[in-house]
């Protein structure tokens, strides 16, 4: 009788203990679930904020790239006028304009505010869309450096080769103390070394414009992915 009573008490205690453990376990599980849910939601908000800034940066980059490509066409057109015009009379009236364009170089500085913020805060891993993440990283670690490197090549050749050779015959920058007639400038442009430097510089500018065009396409592609993600 006593033994049966003890078994009953043990069973009751065990069931109560098991129930309490189960309640605690369920409570902890629910707590973890809501904590994870809140954390995921907070992370999604962080990513959304980053992408909103990134979108603004990409729009600015697109406009900047379009402007630089347009400028590049004008620079190459001026070099073509200087190197391929058969008549001196065609150049005399516009020689200063074309020299100024030929002595210019292409440049592009990407707005990397969002990229730097994401990189410094180590939030790249919060981007769940793998395609977007890959495009984002490729854009800033490969596409942009490739574009800026070619801009630097164009700048270096223009500043260290073309302008110094031009400066032997006339001032590239307007200088009231060193006045050279348009006829003399045209004559200098016809000289073999300067003409060859202009042609080489035109080649660098064309390749740089190709890099700018490639970057523009990549920018638009990334911008579309960002817009798609923000619409979710």
Q: Which residue ranges define each predicted feature?
A:
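Hydrophobic membrane-insertion alpha-helices, especially the h-region
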Residues: 18-33
